[in-house]
Amino acid sequence: MSRIPSSFDYKDNVKDVSEMDFMEKLVFRAKQQPLVPIGCLLTTGAIVLAAQSVRSGNKNKAQVFFRWRVGLQAATLVALLAGSYIYSSNKAERKTEEQLLKEKAKMREQLWIQELERREQETEARRKKAEMFRLKAKENEEASKNLEQELKALESKVNASK
């Protein structure tokens, strides 16, 4: 059965986290807590610079970069914990948002059902109207046949009286 388009249709680009693939989840989580990926990149940069310093034999610079790594890793961990705390405090707010979205979806479904029922009523009204016109046409046809018969009867009387 083909789907009837409706004025209530619209595309929902919002996906549930469980429906997302790996890259979409990664981007979604990075947008939720932007400091964590930045901290990870900075920590990785500090490790790379420390490794280069160790290879070149510069122990003092390597030590500084390893200290930076520890500091950046700690900052990333703090950002992660703070973000999860903030994110969990917004959980109740998100729940109400989700409930509003569910209510909106139910409302859209109700409107869609009402629109389908309205269309069905219109179709039924057209069907009844067409049937009524067919009956009237049949009645008119029968009436015209009766009039033709009466006319023939009158013509035969007129011809008989001449």
Swiss-Prot record:
Parts forming coiled coils: 89-162
Positions of the HIG1 domain: 7-98
InterPro entries reported for this sequence: Hypoxia_induced_domain, RCF1
Signal peptide positions on this chain: none
Cell compartment(s), UniProt: Mitochondrion membrane
Transmembrane annotation, as ranges: 35-54, 64-86
Pfam families tied to this protein: HIG_1_N
A GO CC term attached to the entry: mitochondrial inner membrane
Domain of life: Eukaryota
Topology term for the membrane: Multi-pass membrane protein
UniProt keyword terms in alphabetical order: Coiled coil, Membrane, Mitochondrion, Transmembrane, Transmembrane helix
Family listed: Belongs to the RCF1 family.
UniProt name for this protein: Respiratory supercomplex factor 1, mitochondrial
Annotated source species: Vanderwaltozyma polyspora (strain ATCC 22028 / DSM 70294 / BCRC 21397 / CBS 2163 / NBRC 10782 / NRRL Y-8283 / UCD 57-17) (Kluyveromyces polysporus)
